[in-house]
Amino acid sequence: MDDKEMIGAIQSTMYHQCQWRGYAAPADILVDIGVLSRKKYEDWRYGRISYLESACTVNLRKLSWIMHQIRSYGSQSGLKPSFCYYKQWGVKKLSGQGHKPVIPLRFSKSGNLEIERWYATHFVDSKRIAQLKVETAIRNG
C-alpha cells in the first residue's frame, strides 16, 4: 500500500470508528488498516507481548508517519483528543482478595512519554457521541 492509499485507509477507518462508537483509537486503527493483527493486539493486551510496536508489521519510521496521519486527520476533523489509560487484561487478584493489580501497557520500544501518550490518545467526536446517546435512549426507553 503506497502512502496515498494508506492515508485514505486511515481516514476511512477513523471516520467509520467515529460513526460506529463516537471515537477512533490508534490501536484499533492499526488493526483495521492491516498493520497489526487482531491476535497480536490481544496478545499485547494480555501482556504476552512487551510493547505494541514490536507486534506491528511496519518499521518504526512508517509507524511514526501513520501516527502523524492519525493526529492530522483528528485535528482537521475537529475530533477532541482524549487520553485513555491502557491496562493489561486478564490480571488475577493477588491471593484471591482485594482489588486486582493494575498493570499499565507499553506501546513503544523507547518508552518515551510523548510517544506513549499519542498511542493512548483516542479522538472523540462529541456530536456523534451525543447522537449515539439519544439513539440508545430511544431504543431503551
Regions found by a protein language model. Give the residues of each.
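Phospho-regulated, low-complexity intrinsically disordered regions of nuclear gene-regulatory
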Residues: K39, L60-G141
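Positively charged, polyanion-binding regions of nucleic-acid-associated proteins
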Residues: D2-A27, D32, L36-S37, D43-A55
